[in-house]
Amino acid sequence: MQDTQAFLNHVHVQLQDLRDNGLYKTERVITTPQGAHVRTTDGREVINLCANNYLGLAAHPQVVAAAQRSLESHGFGLSSVRFICGTQDLHKTLEQRIARFLGLEDAILYAAAFDANGVLFEPLLGEGDAVVSDTLNHASIIDGIRLCKARRYRYAHDDMADLDRQLELARAEGARHVMVFTDGVFSMDGTVARLDEMRALCDRHGALLAVDECHATGFMGATGRGTHEHRGLLDDGRSRVDIITGTFGKALGGASGGFTAGPREVIELLRQRSRPYLFSNTLAPAIVGASIAVLDLLEESTALRDRLHANTRWFRAAMAGVGFEIKPGDHPIVPVMVYDAVQAQRLAARLLELGVYVVGFFYPVVPKGQARVRVQVSAAHSHEDLVRAVAAFAQAGRELGLLPADAS
């Protein structure tokens, strides 16, 4: 009992340290479906500018109806892992559909996108191999690389010259197989990876190219296939990226679940060796059925994608017009740079009072001195929503001294 109390005291100290340093995270509870507008528990309706609901599909009537149909036809859950009795026809259909959508041969589903990255490397790469990773890659990628025995190399963020050097080093040190892994879109900056240049470097050094497309699938590229389409690496429907990981928890409906798509042999080896696939319950039928409906919508029309990008262009221009510094780009992730952590939190808090829901990010989520409010634009936002949001930003910016007093 004394040991238990000592441990709990230790945990308490860590929690208090998080609070003292302004790093303690609280959950703001909403009482409505996810959408352009949400209601908080105090009854306020606010414009939601912090969801990954890029295409507005989280509560789309056709997606919800598909989930309900799948619930009725295939049940609530499977109570099994895939290789025992947890594979339904819906699962195989979704795997085939997402692979085809991305231009790859096959795909494997996971209960979470974190798993798709977390278990990719260990089954595929051994002690004689190497993995080369962007320094700003997502935590799931970092954790996955730590689990494997391959040699690890890191290149400076989005630095192609450094990537070239690390690939040369990996080859010079005798790596058998080399995999380069990057986020397609980096979630804190909205930076889009230069996959075309990376493909050329990988070809020069005989390396595989793998990409996490969680913040791209469904809306990046002319038909929403992702960053590889955006960068010209989708030829006649065939991907020139070797392996793609992604999620159904963002643009593709916003529920949960992840996937890895790639060559048929790679996917088959993952089915045999990836531990979450072998030891975790299968993805629920309602999510699978709804995700198939999402792909139906995206293959029928680019209207949602087009609306998202129109909203993004307008919002970026309007925010720059009132005087805010935003990270350049064309992605619906719009970092509004504040630099000071306290000011970022104050700005987010004041915006909530003004009816706009955003979140301030600061160290250790972003580097010290790089605090920002991250805005995520959606196809579900009306033009009026965005006009109101920019006006609220301008008012809060003036009040906090982030903008000149006469900023409009």
Residue positions per predicted region:
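Conserved N-terminal alpha-helix of the aminotransferase class I/II PLP-enzyme fold
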Residues: 65, 69-113
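Active-site PLP attachment segment
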Residues: 223, 229, 236-269
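PLP-dependent aminotransferase class I/II
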Residues: 252-319, 324-327
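Conserved PLP-binding catalytic core of the aspartate aminotransferase-like
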Residues: 306-355, 365, 369-370, 377-379, ...
